[in-house]
Amino acid sequence: MQHKSPVVTWDLFGLDIKFNLASILMVIITSLIVLVIAIACTRNLQKRPTGKQNFIEWVFDFVRGIIESNLAWKKGGQFHFLTVTLILFIFVGNMLGLPFAIVIDHTLWWKSPTADATVTLTLATMVILLTHYYGIKMRGTKNYFKNYGQPFLALTPVNIFEEFTNTLTLGLRLYGNIYAGEILIGLLSSLIIGHAAWGWIIGVPGLIAWQAFSIFIGTIQAYIFIMLSMVYMSHKIADDH
């Protein structure tokens, strides 16, 4: 079944700017969940971690490993909290649309925020802009822009164009995987609801299997996003690139 999105349009200096209220709502909910996780896992920290503290320390160690695979910790350590926040936000966002969807008057309100290309491309743009900022900050303006003429000056347009393709692929890869997963979950749910016993026989096992696979895909996509983010960051701030 097709559902419409709660989109509002604002007229800004003659331009129609559209906002998906469901995506905004889900971004806020995702951010609040990440905030609650962070607060819950870092309260009453102990020298011998247990339970929730073990989990958050594992996340920090896991992310540190990703950073160190691309950058020396002396340079990459400053991105530790940023990368932890990103992986938690993307992972939680990927998971929110899996258990259920909330539809009111044929309008879809509850979904994964990362199933919206605007959200994922915004995240990707933010990351790419940060790579430029830190590249200039840590290498200097002259050395940073000189890098676009490497290895040959004639390749400058290609290197500039690559920045746009990196942004698109980083954002659309995440969006495509999560959106496709939610579409298939919706189709399987419709099969269960709209048909008799055979719909349950086919749909329920398929839905359970696809839910499990979607959890795996959502986890992998969160990992890929931050891994590529650190790869792009290393290309901008490393002296040998």
UniProtKB/Swiss-Prot annotation:
Name where it's found.
Cell membrane
Q: What is its main location?
A: membrane
> Its Gene Ontology molecular function terms?
proton-transporting ATP synthase activity, rotational mechanism
Q: Which CDD domains match?
A: ATP-synt_Fo_a_6
* Record key words, sorted: ATP synthesis, Cell membrane, CF(0), Hydrogen ion transport, Ion transport, Membrane, Transmembrane, Transmembrane helix, Transport
GO CC, one annotated term: proton-transporting ATP synthase complex
A single BP term in Gene Ontology: proton motive force-driven plasma membrane ATP synthesis
Assembly behavior: F-type ATPases have 2 components, CF(1) - the catalytic core - and CF(0) - the membrane proton channel. CF(1) has five subunits: alpha(3), beta(3), gamma(1), delta(1), epsilon(1). CF(0) has three main subunits: a(1), b(2) and c(9-12). The alpha and beta chains form an alternating ring which encloses part of the gamma chain. CF(1) is attached to CF(0) by a central stalk formed by the gamma and epsilon chains, while a peripheral stalk is formed by the delta and b chains.
Specify the protein name: ATP synthase subunit a
